[in-house]
């Protein structure tokens, strides 16, 4: 059983570096049996590598504007990503990436961390660093949604 953690984001853009920071923490001191991939700002480039691992579970972590307080963490239903037109800094919408992978992977979990400041050369804010630490600590023994709440998408 292979679990893959895909960390997404740009460490040069303030809070968008949440994913890469998580990848760094895992590289320094692994938690659980996750195969960690730092997808950076072009995670679509890792589709083939992820498929070759044939994971049972894929956890994608990214800073995502969900309209919450900075540092809040939510599980986002992959089907909601396109509808919400989530603001990400990546070349390709993450729902495309998920659609490419979910045929081959049993479980795809998308975990969003609400950023505060996303801009070139801004430092990462403390609430985001704290959120990354929370996610990192929960990786070992991760079950289901890792104890994180599901994002409630408001009906228009």
Swiss-Prot record:
GO MF, any single term: aspartic-type endopeptidase activity
Enzyme Commission numbers on file: 3.4.23.51
Superkingdom to which the source organism belongs: Bacteria
Gene Ontology biological process terms in this record: protein processing
Binding residues for Ni(2+): 16, 62, 90
Keywords, alphabetical: Aspartyl protease, Hydrolase, Metal-binding, Nickel, Protease
Quaternary structure (record): Monomer.
Family to which this protein belongs: Belongs to the peptidase A31 family.
Role played: Protease involved in the C-terminal processing of HycE, the large subunit of hydrogenase 3.
Protein name (database record): Hydrogenase 3 maturation protease
Species of provenance: Escherichia coli (strain K12)
Lineage: Bacteria, Pseudomonadati, Pseudomonadota, Gammaproteobacteria, Enterobacterales
């Amino acid at each position: 059983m292979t679990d893959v953690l895909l960390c997404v984001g740009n460490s040069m853009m303030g809070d968008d570096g949440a994913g890469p920071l998580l990848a760094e923490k895992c590289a320094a001191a692994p938690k659980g049996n996750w195969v960690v991939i730092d997808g950076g700002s072009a995670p679509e480039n890792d589709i083939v590598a992820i498929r070759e691992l044939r994971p049972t579970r894929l956890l994608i972590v990214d800073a995502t504007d969900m309209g919450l307080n900075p540092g809040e963490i939510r599980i986002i239903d992959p089907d909601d990503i396109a509808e919400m037109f989530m603001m990400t800094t990546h070349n390709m919408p993450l729902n495309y990436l998920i659609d490419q992978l979910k045929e081959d992977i049993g479980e795809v979990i998308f975990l969003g961390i609400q950023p505060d400041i996303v801009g070139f050369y801004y430092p990462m804010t403390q609430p985001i660093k704290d959120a990354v630490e929370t996610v990192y600590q929960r990786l070992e023994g991760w079950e289901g949604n890792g104890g994180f709440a599901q994002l409630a998408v408001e009906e228009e």
